[in-house]
Structures are given as structure tokens and as C-alpha cells.
Amino acid sequence: MRPSYPTTPGTFQVDLRGLVDLLSRHLYRSPDVYVRELLQNAVDAIAARRRLEPGVAGAVEIEVVEPADGPPTVVVTDNGIGLTGTELVELLATIGRSSKRGELAQHRDFIGQFGIGLLACFLVADEITVVTRSARDPDAQALCWQGRADGTYDITPVDSDLTAGTRVHLRARTGFEHHLTRDHVLALARRYGGLLTLPIRLGSVQVNNEPPPWDFPALTMEHGRESALAYASRVLDLDPLDAIPLHADGVRGLAFVLPYEPSPAARQDHRVYLRRMLLSESADRLLPDWAFFVRCVIDADDLSPNAARDGFIEDERLARVREQLGRGIRDHLKDLARLWPARLAGIVATHDAGISALAVHDDECLLLFADWLPVDTSLGRMTLGEHARRFGELRFVRRFDDFRQVAPIAAAQGRCVVNGGHVNLSTLLERLAVLRPERRISELDPTEIVDSFADLTAEERSEVADLVRLAETALRSHDVGVQVRAFAPSQMHATLVTNEDSRFRRQLDRTRSVVDGPWSGVLAALPTASAANSQLCLNVANAAVRELARQARQGSIMRVRRAIELLYVQALLLGHHPLRDRELGLLDDVVLGFVEDRG
């Protein structure tokens, strides 16, 4: 009995139309890449011929035919190496193999790296016609290869005026006519091939007549910098703060400092070329993560493009280039610090987060940039350099909440306290304290603010004794101590001073109140730290507090108690401390008591 399956070797049957649809949806971002693929094949073919005939002058001609009664046709002609009949069969007819694959594997002066080749042209055409004549044989006959979207093809000899080289004809698919119109093809040719060195023409129009930005005069010269900034405005629609020259192994380009502060998590949209052919206008992962404040334009010789040809493969070469480009940006900023400090000041004012991220890992950069880093203080925003000139010693608090707590009091006292709650800032200040001990940089404990308040006289302590006793009774269940001091600003009734342990306990209590299930048991088992260092400091310089002291002496116990509870909740809110359930209930009870005019 004969088996129901073939017993001889077979080949996979490829649904070409389905494969093209897959490419269009998942590999290529736009069918417009067909122009890039045609230009790439032409450039590669000319590079191959130059290896055979070093003196040949390469050229690429594009023609667009737009008949009144039919779809447009695009014709791309090059005077490259051409193809023999054997190559047509072995290469063009084999899905997944580039028409230049063998040579591409051997020579770095070719752009192409993948066997997508003419397959991309099926994104916009149902039929591709290739007329070619090989330069390897002076007697070679011109051949015509016709491939169709159903996966069939045929090869025939033809009479053609084509000398050595290749001519590709594409006729627009239904629904894709716009992609093959003259204006659209011209725009795409300029976009993808505008920086290629080979002359490319569409009819009488020279497509590539602009020098690449990395060939501008040295950016240390003002006219070179102006040319680079003008390029960014014209091509990238960007008005950058500065232009930075980039150099790495086989890579050259420019980095433009953004005129706004992007999110560190934002995608880096860089413009990348491979041997002057545009690959992508939205590539990322080219620079270190800290360099999110620049957008670059680069050209690479040896980096490997990914399958979609819209970026580079993440490999050791790209990692090395990324490190080198980051070093170049860092060195440029160092040069600005020495030579153009005003320019650097403008950059740091906009991108202090990125500069800080760089300085965290580089002591030299920290020393260079420290004086330009802006900080928020109790006396307003200023640079660290300005702070050093005005105040000498620098005191900072580590947390935003601590800064909110101490800032109004410190400002009223004329003290300049730095908010170290911003990303990396506390780390930078601690490191700067080690590198520059003469700057006298140290962390401020918020309790030091209370310690700086003037002590009361014996008479004043006697006047507020009843108030302190009532306040301690009212707040005992909240584990809060009470002090009375006189401090500025007099408009502040009270301030709540906490330490790390009391903040942890407050957050733990708040979490316990909203968590149930297995985690509630875990939280219940956690040890509870003492909150003895949480202190409500009443301000006797405030008229309302003095009135409460008077009423306490007169025995208005309930009214004073309600007022103390209200001042406690107010201090919590002003200090941005999380309210626990019992404090929310306390606030509700206090408000209700005043509404009902109890006590």
C-alpha cells in the first residue's frame, strides 16, 4: 500500500500575499518603506559594481508615470552590478534571501542586512518587474523577472537599452495609488535618501543636495553651531538650547539639547541613519538613560539594523557606542562649564533632573555642575552656587514633607533650608559634602527648628500651664506631646514636629486601617515604635493661642479642648501627614461641636 504522504524531500509553500500582509501589520510601520528598499538595493548594487570596477560613477534615476486612466507607476534605475540569470533564480525567487546577501555578508560598505529586499515592494504593488543586465559579463543579455503577489514569477530575455545595472517597475495596487504619486515619491526619496552620496534624481530634480548635519563646521565655531541649530529647526521642528557633536566607533552625529524638560520615562525619538540611509525618525536606546534631555541625529557604519530596519539590534557594538556617545555628551557639558558657563546655566536650569542623574555617578561632573544646579529653599529658588555665596553653610531636609513643615518657620527666621526631597538631590548634597567639606553641607533634623525657638520666661510658662495641661490630656490618645514656644511667623498657630519613627508609626496605623485579609495579620505583628518625639508646638506669639491660654486659665475646658484638637488636625494637614481614621473622626467631631456650639 502506497503512503498517503510524499516520501521525497519537499519545500514549504509560502502564501506570499499573506506574508506581505503580515509584514505590513507587524514589521513595517508604513508601506512607504518600499522607497527605502528600492534605494537601498540600488546603493548596494552600485557598491558591488565599484568593487568590480573601482572607477565607475554610480547614479540612481527615479521616474514616476501618472497616466490619466490608470494607476501610477514608479521606475527606479541604477547602474550597479546587475544580476545574471542564475542570480535571478537563486536570489530574487527565494523568499527571505536578499538580492545581495552573499556580498553583504562579506563587505561592510553595503547597507542591506536582511532578505526582505523586493518583498517590501509588494506592500504597494501586486506585480514587480525587474529588468537587469550583469556587469560581470560584457556579453550578458538583459533579463526580465516578473514576480506576482500570488507567488508566481517568470524570467525571460528581453531587448533593452539598459546597460549594466537594474531597473525596477512598480505599478500601484488598488487603494495604494497615493503612495506612488510623484510628489509623494519625491518626498520619500528626500526623506530616506537625502543624505546619500550617490546622485539621486527624480526627473530633473536632484533629490539629495543637502550636506549631513555632522559635516557642519566645528561646533565650537559660532557659525557651525548656528548651522546645526538651523538644521534642527528646519528638519526636526526643534529650537534646541545647544548642539553637541557626537563621535563613537563608526558613528558620527549631533545631539540637540531639548528646550523643554521631558519625562525621564518618555521614549527617546532619535533620527538614525545607516551609511547615510535613513532608518528611523523614532529610534530609542541609543543613549544612556540619563541623557533623556537630548535628541540626536546619528549615522552609523557598522551597527546592525533590526528586522524592521527602523533601529539597531541590541548587541555589544551598540552598548559600546551608547557608552561612547554618553561620554561625548558629558565631555561637552564639561567644556561648557569651563568655556561657556552662561550657556550651561541655561541648560541646567531646564534639565536639572538629567544633569543630576549624570552627576550622581560622576564626581567630576558633580564638581563641575554643582554651582549651576537649581534648588528650592525656604527663601525661594536659587542655584547651589548662589546659596554658597549668600549663606555659606548649607542645611537640607531629606523629605518633601519635612520641607513643607519647616520652610515657613525657617523663612520667617531668615534661615535658608534646602529641600532635598527632589530626585537625587539628597544623594548629591551628601556626596558634595564629602568632596567639598569647606561648603559645610549637612542634613537638618526638623526638631532642630523647635530647639531654635526662644524659651518662655517663668511668667509666660505660668500663663500657659493650664493650656499645656489641657492640650496634653486632649492629645494623649494620639501619642503627641505638647510644647508652647514663641516663634515666627506669628500667623502660624502651631506646628507638628515628627521624627522618622513617628512618621513610620503613623503610616503603619493608616495602612492597618485600610488593609484586611492575610496582610492585616502581618501588619498587626509589626512592632510599634514610640511616638514620644511627635510634638505639637503651640505658638504663643499667635493671638488665638494666647486667647486659648486665657480661656484655659478661666476654666473653659471643653472649648479649649475642641480648639486644641482642631489645631492638631490643622497641623497634620499643613505638614501633609496622612490622617488616620481616629483623626478623621476627631475632625468631624470638632466641627460638629463648633456647629452645635457645645462647651
Residue ranges and their predicted role:
Residues 1-188, 588:
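GHKL (Bergerat-fold) ATPase N-terminal catalytic module, capturing the glycine-rich phosphate-binding loop
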Residues 110-112, 131-152, 173-178, 183-599:
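GHKL/Bergerat-fold ATPase module in large chromosome/replication-associated machines
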